[in-house]
Amino acid sequence: MKRSTVLGSLWMVVVVSVLGHQPVMDMAPRWAGGYGVQLFQVHSIADDLRHGESMLPNPQGLESRVDTTWLEGVYTFRREFRITAKVPYVDKSRQWLRDGEIIRQTGHGLGDIIIGAPIKKYVNKKGYTYNLSLTPNLRLPTGSTDDDWAVGDGSWDAGLSLSYSFETPKWYHLYDLYYWKNGSGRNFDHGDELAFDANIGWHAWHDGDNGRGLFLMLDIAARHIEPGKNQMVDPAGDTIAVGPVAMYYHEDWMLKFEYRQVVYDKAETMRFGDHRRFAVGFGLTF
């Protein structure tokens, strides 16, 4: 089988923005010695205030913006085992109230690098294939804590993911459950996180002769974050976000666009809500 044809089917797996802690390319390439890189730009904004399930008045126009550029990579030792890495650069700002006064906080620089080691079990059947994956992760304290709104918290964090994916020539499903245990930071702590992601994809178009095609997906992301310590704005609470994903691939490269909107939000304390997330990514496999 031509390598371009193989890549055409692999991009069905690459498309998913799964496991908020792993590269979108964590499952490809599948051949021993293969590797891939991706540049992923994420823009998140929020301008509503929440407490519990209620939206609060925001007469001061408080708002939050986070822009993160991810350099993501994967190396496949053998089909069942690979190493992944995510290196973020963060630029963010927010307005908040302190003692009744509006303050502006900013932060920028290298964020916390994430290393993962997916272990996979593939099963091929007539007309479909599926795989199970167990992925330990380590988040390194590489992000600075010096800015007004720190890009890191100085802690070593451990994560574990269990996922299941299923694909046919026309459909792709992925379900992922993961947990982050956050360590003690410098002066403040982030709360632990439990999350579930579901990706449902449709292979809308495929040109096998030229190794190109288009995927359309629905992305669903549910999060539960425990309260942290000494944070001016604690993200603790429960959220569910949904949105579309579109990805075009051509042989060894792919271009991806996604949008995600929070549809359910329950905040432990007053914080920003109604988050909107826009992202674009470009990836290559070798």
Question: How would you name each of these model-derived features?
Answer:
Residues 17-54, 125:
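Outer-membrane beta-barrel biogenesis signature
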Residues 25-33, 80, 123-131, 169-170, ...:
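Short loop/turn motifs that connect adjacent beta-strands in outer-membrane beta-barrel proteins
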Residues 33, 65-69, 108-113, 130, ...:
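Residues that define the transmembrane beta-barrel architecture of outer-membrane proteins
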Residues 37-43, 85-89, 134-140, 175-179, ...:
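Transmembrane beta-barrel strands of outer-membrane/channel proteins
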Residues 39, 71-75, 85, 115-121, ...:
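Residues on the lipid-exposed face of transmembrane beta-strands in outer-membrane beta-barrel proteins
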Residues 43-68, 148-149:
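Surface-exposed strand-loop-strand hairpins of Gram-negative outer-membrane beta-barrel proteins
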Residues 50-52, 59, 190, 194-286:
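Outer membrane beta-barrel transmembrane domains
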Residues 91-191, 249:
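Outer-membrane pore/translocation modules
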